[in-house]
A protein has these predicted regions:
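Amphipathic alpha-helical assembly/interaction segments
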Residues: 1-125
Length: 125
C-alpha cells in the first residue's frame, strides 16, 4: 500500500512539473507577441493576457506544494478558459473593424495549441 502511495505521489509531482514547464514555454512564446498589440490594447487586453498567464504559472507552483490539488486544478482550468477567450478576442477582426486584429491567425493558432495542451494536461490529471 505504501509503495502505491509513493508511486502515485511521484507520478503526480511529475505531471505538475510538466504543466508548469508548458506554462513557462507558453509565456516565453506569448510575451513577445504582446508587445506588437496596437497601442489601444497594449495595456488593457495584452495586460490581461499577461496577467492570466502569470496567474497560471503561480497556480502551477502552488500545485507542486499542495497535497490536495483539486480546487487549485479547478481554478487553473478556469484560468485556461479565460486565456482562451482573451486570445480569441485578440484575434477577432471585429474588435476594431478598421484595424487588423491584435493577433494574426498563425500566431493565434500556435498560441492556442500551447493553451490546449495545458488544458488537456489539467483535464488528464
Amino acid at each position: 500500500m505504501e509503495e502505491i502511495q509513493q508511486e502515485e505521489k511521484k507520478h503526480n509531482g511529475n505531471d505538475i512539473f510538466h504543466i508548469k514547464e508548458k506554462i513557462y514555454e507558453m509565456i516565453l512564446y506569448g510575451n513577445p507577441q504582446l508587445k506588437d498589440f496596437p497601442k489601444a490594447e497594449r495595456y488593457v487586453l495584452a495586460g490581461d493576457i499577461r496577467k492570466t498567464m502569470y496567474t497560471m504559472l503561480e497556480m502551477a507552483v502552488r500545485l507542486e506544494k499542495k497535497y490536495h490539488k483539486k480546487t487549485t486544478l479547478q481554478d487553473l482550468d478556469i484560468e485556461v478558459d479565460v486565456l482562451r477567450n482573451l486570445l480569441r478576442l485578440a484575434k477577432d477582426p471585429n474588435l476594431y473593424p478598421n484595424q487588423k486584429p491584435c493577433l494574426d491567425f498563425h500566431t493565434w493558432e500556435v498560441w492556442m495549441r500551447k493553451v490546449d495542451e495545458i488544458g488537456r494536461m489539467i483535464g488528464g490529471y
